[in-house]
């Protein structure tokens, strides 16, 4: 807008995952398949108070689409549960940057938690007592995050940076799914016999099958990173970084097959091209390697191991286009 006020717009995907196993694998009660896709539209404003202090903030419209399939928890028979749903929700972010001297700056930023409630389709299949489908809801809460960063320019074309990120994964206590009308569940022949012989048990089974929760009970996690940017020319910049992220899983029995997290090592690289003073194109590649515990237990209260994830690796690639008005 002017030399001290900026408007911006970012479109990103802050969270996401996809995982799939065979429907008949031995630990299907711990998860069969899952995917979460997000798109975050974040208009923002920044104000340069003076040569030393800048403030910023924004509001995000976050679209989430999720698909979850899992074996039905113990106690309500066998079979599979599946949910597909999507919806919009809103969060906000705030930031502060301090530049005590020309070649050194510090930043602090905060992003709020999001209460995600999606609407979609709820399915129960292959159960001994009841099966059916209908409208349903999915609920979870994303973590609030705090970033603390520092950037130093020791020489003209080199910038060194460090970052610490705190993510309050305590908010990610569970994922809850419910069917709007449990009468959409139709009793099997065996279920009808149970209903005649024990109406109370049949009611408990209907409630259990129409309200399924996947327990996470995670803890807050930290990420620490170091990086460097080198300007090869006025148009080209290369960069690289390394980061270590702590394990958010409170105890190992809580690890599910759907989100098998652990301590992680990040390795990243990228480059920027400025064809004109107003346009910039950024490209990045990252590799995440799980380096912590990888055991999977029979349930979140069991000491029986049913397996171990041989590898927990991920690869990421991204690109961005920036235009400065």
Please name every model-derived segment.
Residues 1-325:
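Outer-membrane beta-barrel porins/channels
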